[in-house]
A protein has these predicted regions:
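Non-catalytic, polymerase-adjacent accessory regions of viral genome-replication enzymes
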Residues: 1-42
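Short helix/loop capping segments that flank catalytic or ligand/cofactor-binding pockets
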Residues: 16, 87-88, 144-146
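Active-site substrate-recognition loop segments, prototypically the cytochrome P450 B′-helix/B-C loop
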Residues: 27, 31-101, 110
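Short alpha-helical scaffolding segments that buttress acidic/His motifs in well-ordered protein cores
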Residues: 16-20, 90, 167-172
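Conserved polymerase palm-domain catalytic core
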Residues: 51-66, 70, 105-106, 110-230
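Conserved residues at beta->alpha junctions
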Residues: 7, 81-82, 229
């Protein structure tokens, strides 16, 4: 069975819908709330599924919002519509299942059963084992600079389904709506949608594998990487 059929299965779509409803969240550019989403899907489910299957579905741009960071700056988020969040979640679920089997044990961000506390616990274990030197790596503006072609190339190694990859690319290129103006997204994965966190882990898994290949001790949470050594 092709991955797109797994994504579009009733069970997977229902699971994705329930996840989006449970997370609540703001509406996107179309103004449709999570509370209104169920009725919309019931009326349009067949049309939505058909358009996703035959590649005619067009995601709406994300709505740009900013949230304050601890350093006084603001973090840009992109809020997809409630429907697009559901579709993204439906894509993210089976892709996460595929990659969970190959992701590094030292990657802790946005993975089921893992948290920042686990990443901190791993770092403390390194210190207790005598690793006194620490290098903290924060990949500057990582989410804004992800190369779309490179990401699709990496995904293709495990996702052998052109319809699914085409849909993911559409979400990467969906654009951003800010102050009434739509801007194209040439690079990056806007933070705020279920797909962005999965794609970021897939992209950075190459870094994890390189660190492991070099025999380095590390822990990674999203785009924050901590490496340790004795000297």
């Amino acid at each position: 069975m092709e991955l797109i059929e797994v994504i579009l299965s009733k069970e997977n779509l229902n699971r994705a819908y329930k996840k989006v409803v449970a997370n609540k969240g703001a509406s996107g550019v179309d103004g449709v709330t999570v509370e209104e989403l169920g009725d919309y899907i019931r009326k349009n489910r067949e049309k939505i599924v058909t358009s996703l299957r035959n590649r005619t579905y067009i995601p709406k741009p994300v709505r740009r919002v900013y949230i304050p960071k601890d350093n006084g700056k603001k973090r840009p988020l992109g809020i997809p519509t409630a429907l697009d969040r559901t579709i993204q979640q439906a894509i993210a679920q089976p892709i996460s299942d595929i990659y969970e089997e190959i992701f590094s044990d030292y990657s802790y961000g946005f993975r089921a059963g893992r948290s920042c506390h686990d990443a901190i616990r791993q770092a403390l274990e390194y210190l207790n084992d005598g690793y006194e030197w620490v290098v903290d790596i924060d990949i500057e503006q990582f989410f804004d600079k992800v190369n779309h072609d490179k990401l699709i190339q990496i995904l293709r190694e495990q996702v052998n389904d052109s319809t699914t990859l085409n849909l993911i690319r559409k979400y990467l290129k969906a654009g951003v709506m800010e102050n009434g103006l739509e801007k194209a997204t040439i690079t990056g994965v806007p933070q705020g949608g279920p797909l962005s966190v999965v794609c970021s882990n897939v992209y950075l898994d190459k870094l994890d594998k390189e660190l492991e290949h070099r025999g380095l001790r590390f822990t990674r949470y999203a785009d924050d990487v901590l490496t340790v050594s004795y000297t």
